[in-house]
A protein has these predicted regions:
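Chalcogenol-based redox active-site neighborhoods
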Residues: 1-121
């Protein structure tokens, strides 16, 4: 996804299985952030930062949606544990991460694997 590209209308399904569409946010600003994995330290820090600033973001007219390749059940645990006030897209088939270009080869501790690049739009 590049600046100026049109985002897909159907973003995916949230932690409860509800479809999330881009048109749901018409007239509002949307922060869509991608993260690698629920319940990990870096992703928890990022989600909690957005949680802690959520009221301010809402006052400025923003909505926040997170997305990872974790399933809805895992998202529900992550939301409950960290009291997240926003929805998380369960992109288990990797459709959205591929459309936005945030899925690819990563390296950690000398190991190469496929994963989500931490990215915010």
């Amino acid at each position: 996804m590049n600046i100026g590209d049109k985002a897909p209308e159907i973003l995916g399904h949230d932690e409860n299985g509800n479809e999330i569409r881009l048109s749901d946010f018409k007239g509002r600003k949307l922060v869509l952030y991608f993260y690698p994995k629920d319940l990990t330290s870096g992703c928890t820090t990022e989600a909690c930062n957005l949680r802690d600033n959520y009221t301010k973001l809402k006052e400025l007219g923003y909505e926040v949606i997170g997305a990872s390749v974790d399933d809805g059940k895992q998202h529900l645990k992550f939301i409950a544990k960290n009291e997240l006030p926003f929805h998380l897209i369960a992109d288990t088939e990797k459709t959205l991460v591929e459309q936005f270009g945030v899925w690819g080869e990563k390296k950690m501790y000398g190991r190469t694997y496929m994963g989500t690049f931490r990215t915010t739009f």
